Amino acid sequence: MDLSYLRSVSKFLTILGLIAVLLLAPAAHADEEPPADDGGNGEEASQIEDYASYEPQTTCHPKPRVGTRVLAEWLTSELGGGGGATGRACGGGASEHKDGRAIDWTLNATSQADRKIAKAFLKAVFATDEEGNTHALARRMGIMYVIWNDHMYSAWDEFERDGYLSSSCKSKRKCSKTLRHRDHMHISLSMAGAKGKTSWYEGRMD
C-alpha cells in the first residue's frame, strides 16, 4: 500500500481527534471555579453566543486583534496549514483585515490532505453540540463568515453553504486562485470574537 496515503489518513484521523477534544473539553482548567456573579440573569458565563451579525469595517486597526491571533495560532499549530492573522493598511475599500478581524489560513484546494483538513474543520465548527446548540463552535469563536474554495458560509444565514464569486471577477475561469479562496481559507470574526470576548477564548488568552 502507498505509504504516503497511509500517512495522509493518519494525519487526517489525528486532526479529527484534536477537533473532537476541542468540542468536548472546556477551555478553562478543570480546577477553576465559575465566577460567583453571573450578571444577575441566572446564566453561566460560558453561555453560547448568538449568531454574529454582519459588522463591516468602520475603524482602522491594521494589526490583528488578540482573539484573531489566538484563533489563527490555534489553527496552524493544532490543525496544520500556514498563514494566520493578517492585517492590511487602511486605504482603499473596506475589509476586516483592516481592523484586525480576519484570518487567511493557508490551505490548498488542489491538495487532498488540505481539503480534508478544511472539511474536518468546517464540520466541527458547524456541528450541533450536546446541548442542542446549532453551529456551536463557530458561534463560540465569534465567526462572522468563512470563504473557502468558491463558497461562503455566513453567520447571518446560519452558515448555509452559498456559492462565492469575488466582485473583482467576472467568472471563476477568469478569477485567480487567491480571489477564489482556493489557496487559503478566509475567516472573518465579529468584533467580540476578534477581541477574545466570546466563550471559546476563555482560558486561552494567557
Give the positions of each predicted feature.
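Secretory targeting and sorting signals
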Residues: 2-31
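Catalytic micro-motifs at enzyme active sites that drive phosphoryl/nucleotidyl and oxygen chemistry
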Residues: 90-95, 170-177
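A short, structural micro-pattern
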Residues: 1-5, 99, 140, 179-183
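Cleaved targeting-peptide boundary
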Residues: 30-41
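Low-complexity, Gly/Ser/Thr/Pro-rich intrinsically disordered linker/tail segments
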Residues: 182-206
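Secreted/periplasmic proteins that engage bacterial cell-wall peptidoglycan
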Residues: 40-155, 188-189
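Short, low-order "capping/linker" segments at domain edges
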Residues: 151-172
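Conserved, short, structured surface segments that act as functional micro-motifs
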Residues: 165, 172-191
